[in-house]
Every structure is written in C-alpha cells, then in structure tokens.
C-alpha cells in the first residue's frame, strides 16, 4: 500500500526519483497516466491491468465512457525505473500536470500521485475546509 507525502524535484532530463518506500511495490516497470485533478497517476503493472480490465468492460456506446477511456489511455505510458530509482516523466504528462521542477509525490493506497508543488498546496488549502463535509458524505457510501 502506498502511503505518505514526499517532496522531490525533477532533474534537468525530466527525471523524477521515486521515494524508496514506493519502489518495491511500484516495480521496475509501471504505468503513468493523466490523473484527475491535474496530477499524474502511477500504477504498478498488476493494478493497471485491473483498471484496464474494468474500463474495457464498460459499454463503449456511452459517450461519457468513451471520453474517459480516451482521456485515461491516451495519456498513459509504460515507464521504467533506473538503478537509482529514477524515471523520466513524459513531457505530455508534465505539461498536463503543470510540473516544471518541484513536485509532491503522495501515496494513495493502490496508486501514487505526482503533483506540482503549487497545485498540491492549492488543492490542500481548498479541500481542508470541506473535509468534514466529505467525511459526512462518505458515511452514505458505508465508510
């Protein structure tokens, strides 16, 4: 399970260092894609395969399904870790997430998210005031 928050910076080659605590679980080959809220999602291969299977099972005749599947898969790339735990983030994903140099890498259970530091700060400032409301709504889902 991916947990925690880490600050990192991209190097001049667009590489990011994956936190040591995440490396074993993410594996040496993993998938990066456009995430929700303008971040980048990273998935271990086995988790990606589960999501891929679920998305393929959705009815492609629905416009919302087609739109989401296009969004999710068109931005996806299979990435490799080098021996130092680094991986090149594709330019299209960096541009999508507004990442220039400084990033926040967070563990979110079954995936890792990479945020520009600025967007993560803004997200947290805006979300803090609504955490209680969100928690109340989650009760309706049985959590």
UniProtKB/Swiss-Prot annotation:
Task: Give the chief site where it resides.
Answer: cytoplasm
GO BP: any one term: negative regulation of DNA-templated transcription initiation
| Subcellular localization(s) per the UniProt record | Cytoplasm, Nucleoid
Q: Which organism is it from?
A: Syntrophomonas wolfei subsp. wolfei (strain DSM 2245B / Goettingen)
Alphabetical GO CC annotations of the entry are: cytoplasm; nucleoid
Q: Under what name is this protein listed?
A: Transcriptional regulator MraZ
Q: Give me the disulphide-bonded residues.
A: none
Gene Ontology terms for molecular function:
DNA-binding transcription factor activity; transcription cis-regulatory region binding
| Keyword flag Transcription | yes
Keywords tagged on the record: Cytoplasm, DNA-binding, Repeat, Transcription, Transcription regulation
Q: Which residues form the SpoVT-AbrB domain?
A: 5-47, 76-119
Q: How does it assemble?
A: Forms oligomers.
The protein's matches in Pfam families, at most eight in alphabetical order, are given as: MraZ (PF02381)
Q: Which HAMAP family match?
A: MraZ (MF_01008)
InterPro entries linked to this entry: MraZ, MraZ_C, MraZ_dom, MraZ_N, MraZ_sf, SpoVT-AbrB_dom, SpoVT-AbrB_sf
Instruction: Report if keyword Repeat is assigned.
Output: yes
Question: What family is reported?
Answer: Belongs to the MraZ family.
Gene3D superfamilies named in the record: Transcriptional regulator MraZ domain
Source organism, top-level taxon = Bacteria
NCBIfam families, sorted: division/cell wall cluster transcriptional repressor MraZ (TIGR00242)
């Amino acid at each position: 399970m991916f947990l925690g928050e880490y600050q990192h910076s991209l190097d001049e080659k667009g590489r990011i260092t994956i936190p040591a605590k995440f490396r074993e679980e993410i594996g040496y080959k993993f998938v990066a894609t456009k995430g929700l809220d303008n971040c980048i999602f990273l998935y271990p291969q086995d988790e990606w395969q589960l999501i891929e299977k679920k998305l393929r099972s959705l009815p492609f005749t629905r416009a919302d399904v087609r739109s989401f599947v296009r969004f999710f898969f068109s931005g996806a790339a299979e990435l490799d870790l080098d021996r130092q735990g680094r991986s090149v983030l594709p330019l299209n994903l960096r541009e999508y997430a507004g990442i220039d140099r400084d990033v926040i890498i967070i563990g979110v259970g079954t995936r890792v998210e990479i945020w520009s530091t600025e967007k993560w700060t803004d997200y947290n400032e805006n979300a803090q005031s609504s955490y209680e409301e969100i928690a109340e709504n989650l009760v309706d889902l049985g959590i």
